[in-house]
């Protein structure tokens, strides 16, 4: 079970296409949330702007996955530490999940930035 979230549709489109091309894995249709503007590689922009704006839609996607499960013990959130969507929006969604489902374990897996990042502010997020 998965919900994919990004503020730029290209990343989600690429991931779902790559998974589908393998023939071994695919993501459920309708379990993605994308917007048209990125977070500008800025944690605060992701957390304070995009996070509150997309929290309800993402929460409903997560709720649908939890309700479809026979039993749910927790939510695993993978988020990139570089940039504004993974770090900022991811942190906001993690807090929202914790508030919405206090009985579930919430585990966050960090995806560390590359040593050769192409964005100057990457280490500061």
Segments (PLM) and residue ranges:
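Segments that form or flank anion-binding pockets
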Residues: 1-125
